[in-house]
Amino acid sequence: MMTMFEEVEVEAYVYPTEDIRKVKKAMLNLIPGLQFEAFDKGEYVILVGRTKDKRALQRLYELFRGQQILDTARMMLEEGYFGEEIIIKVHKQVAYVGKVNFNEDSPLGPITITIRTKEPQKLMKWLAPRTKDGVPIE
C-alpha cells in the first residue's frame, strides 16, 4: 500500500473513573503503533497518540469492510475533511472491544482521529470507496 498520509493523530479525554490503559487499548485497537503523550488537566487527562507508520490505517480499512460500514465511513470522512486534514470521531467504549462506531455521544467523550494527508481524495477512495449494493465501485 502506498503512503497517502503524513501522520495519524488520535486523541481522547481520560476521566478519573476511567483506566488510562483501557483508553490506550481502545485507541490502539483502531490505530496500532501509536506513541503516546499524556497531558494532565486536573479534571481529566488528554491522551494523544501519534504515528507515521504507513500501515497505521490498515486496521480501520479492515474494520470498515468487516463491519460493512463503508458507506457510513465514507460519509464521515467527507464530513470531517478540511484541507489537508480528515477528522473522524468514534465511540470510545466500542473501540475498546475492537470495533468502529461513529456515534460519538458517549458520556466519556469520543476518540478523535486526525489524518494529515496531502492526498485526501485518494486516501478516502482507498479507505472507504463508494459502494453500490455494498460492493466498492471506485
Curated annotation (Swiss-Prot):
This is UPF0201 protein PH1010. Belongs to the UPF0201 family. Signal peptide: none annotated. Gene3D superfamilies: 3.30.1440.10. It holds the Pfam family RNA_binding. Disulfide bonds: none annotated. InterPro entries: PAB1135-like, Ribosomal_uL5_dom_sf.
